[in-house]
């Protein structure tokens, strides 16, 4: 570690080591939330914080089973109508009662096109108030994933939003701010008391929460720390209690540190490269008059040039699983028999490029975040070097995740690295978000590479309403194989995500990378 990095680490550790009560959880990771608006950005770190303050009608248990939350019961009135009985006596953090009006309002808000959370109400046509403690969801068709999706349909106070003129979802991609992007009004187990972007979020336990946590955490302090050495130094010095972004080079050392422990676990997140497949010409390339990535042979060449095993061995130090599929183990639809990527083959890649009309390669740009995924910028550096061996001269543009994602949502990236976690643990979520042709609704709502494949579209549309499990899983399998074989994106690997913490911290590792303070105990 350089003197400059060591000094920065010591300074941050000293600031974090201010006296904390025994029931304060000091948690750090490399990436900050994007917003406090629960309907704006489908971003795992943001959702991990938001789930402490906002709640859905249902939630996941410690074992990812759907269980009651703001709804106590649901009944399938018909194939396209589900009645939810709401929990009585629940109050928002300002003391106002939770009612059906808040559910109806939040549904209208999350569906607004400037947000990216509409995927969680996919298939829902309307939410109708029956009475103050009952709502009906009217579906477009039978929706097998309804309950698993509704975990992330966060309910906001209607009266609070109206009072503060924040009934519209924040337009994050255009850098808009609204009252809800900086303030919170939910019913959850914790109140967000302060947020200083890129510095700190503080949360305090909600004494009026309707449920009782299994843990004893009364306060949460979340600190985004981009620098790997600084983040690790904060844990070693006692400045933080838990890290959920471990630098791969430090995992072995931290295992041997007295007073610390490693909580091992995989993550349902796949790291991949997306290419602009829909523009007439691709910006950032020296190919004019056509889309260089539209030729499948070019996509195959770019994929074959990447040595995933080398990235796993060196950059990731074993903390990844090389991938051919766009979903990870633990996601419904994953099949290890389909997930073995072809070995890197530069000679074959060069031949494919020559056959496609690029015997000397071409120039392009690769956009990459540098504070979001494990070793994200280093992975992009690896890929750029591997592409250079086949004559593809890629310029790397790496930046903080906030401007990266804003540019991505404005279709400014010709090729980019992204990681995709599966919040509902079902491959439809991935296929519908990333590969389905983009519409004004949930379909393709994260398809910023302009992928459009009629076969995948047909399969996704069918699986959204298919209630026969075997038939639906066959559709998922076919769509995943089609995505793989047509190289609609280039999967690199599935992340392995151990967490490190002090010995006195007990919590549950979450494959969705969303720690929950309600499951955490500090002794």
Model-assigned labels for residue ranges:
Residues 100-106, 132-138, 188-189, 217-219, ...:
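Alpha-helical secondary-structure segments
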Residues 443, 499-523:
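Long beta-strand-rich cores associated with HINT superfamily self-processing modules
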Residues 178, 207-253, 296, 384, ...:
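Ligand-site clamp/hinge motif
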Residues 75, 119-168:
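Surface-exposed binding/hinge segments that line
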Residues 297-300, 304, 312, 389-404, ...:
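Extracytoplasmic/peripheral linker and loop segments enriched in polar/acidic and small residues
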Residues 28-77, 108, 183-189:
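N-terminal lobe/hinge region of extracytoplasmic solute-binding protein
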Residues 304, 321-355, 372-376:
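Structural transition elements
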Residues 65, 154-215, 219, 346-347, ...:
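Gly/Pro-rich hinge or "lid" segments in bacterial periplasmic/extracellular proteins
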């Amino acid at each position: 570690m350089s003197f400059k990095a060591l000094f920065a680490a010591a300074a941050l550790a000293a600031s974090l080591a201010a006296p904390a009560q025994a029931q304060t959880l000091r948690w750090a990771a490399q990436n900050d939330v994007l917003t406090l608006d629960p309907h704006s950005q489908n971003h795992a770190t943001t959702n991990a914080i938001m789930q402490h303050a906002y709640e859905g009608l249902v939630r996941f248990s410690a074992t990812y089973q759907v269980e009651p939350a703001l709804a106590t019961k649901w009944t399938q009135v018909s194939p396209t109508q589900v009645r939810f009985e709401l929990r009585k006596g629940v109050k928002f953090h300002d003391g106002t009662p939770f009612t059906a009006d808040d559910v109806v309002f939040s549904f209208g808000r999350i569906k607004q096109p400037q947000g990216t959370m509409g995927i969680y109400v996919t298939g829902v046509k309307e939410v109708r108030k029956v009475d103050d403690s009952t709502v009906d969801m009217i579906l477009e068709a039978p929706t097998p994933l309804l309950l698993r999706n509704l975990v992330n349909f966060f309910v906001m106070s209607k009266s609070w939003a109206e009072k503060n003129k924040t009934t519209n979802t924040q337009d994050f991609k255009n850098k808009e701010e609204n009252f809800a992007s900086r303030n919170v009004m939910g019913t959850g187990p914790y109140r967000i008391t302060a947020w200083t972007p890129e510095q700190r979020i503080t949360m305090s336990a909600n004494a009026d929460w309707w449920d009782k946590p299994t843990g004893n955490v009364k306060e949460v302090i979340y600190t985004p720390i981009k620098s790997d050495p600084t983040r690790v130094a904060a844990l070693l010095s006692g400045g933080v209690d838990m890290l959920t972004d471990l630098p791969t080079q430090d995992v072995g050392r931290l295992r041997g540190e007295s007073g610390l422990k490693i909580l091992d676990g995989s993550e349902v997140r796949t790291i991949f490269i997306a290419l602009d497949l829909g523009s007439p010409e691709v910006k950032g390339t020296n190919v004019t008059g056509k889309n260089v990535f539209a030729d499948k042979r070019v996509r195959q060449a770019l994929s074959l040039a990447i040595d995933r095993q080398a990235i796993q061995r060196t950059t990731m130090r074993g903390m990844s699983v090389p991938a051919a599929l766009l979903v990870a183990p633990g996601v419904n639809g994953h099949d290890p028999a389909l997930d073995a990527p072809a070995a890197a083959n530069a000679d074959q890649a060069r031949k494919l490029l020559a056959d496609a009309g690029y015997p000397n390669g071409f120039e392009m740009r690769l956009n990459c975040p540098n504070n979001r995924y494990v070793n994200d910028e280093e992975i992009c550096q690896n890929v750029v070097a591997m592409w250079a061996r086949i004559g593809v001269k890629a310029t790397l543009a790496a930046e903080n995740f906030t401007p990266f994602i804003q540019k991505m949502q404005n279709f400014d990236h010709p090729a980019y690295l992204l990681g995709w976690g599966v919040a509902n643990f079902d491959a439809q979520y991935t296929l519908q978000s990333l590969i389905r042709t983009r519409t004004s609704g949930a379909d393709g709502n994260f398809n910023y590479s302009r992928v459009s494949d009629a076969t995948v579209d047909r399969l996704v549309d069918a699986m959204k309403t298919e209630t026969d499990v075997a038939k639906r899983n066959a559709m998922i399998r076919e769509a995943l194989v089609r995505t793989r074989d047509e190289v609609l994106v280039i999967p690199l690997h599935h992340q392995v995500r151990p967490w490190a913490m002090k010995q006195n911290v007990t919590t549950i590792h979450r494959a969705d990378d969303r720690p929950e303070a309600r499951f955490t105990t500090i002794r």
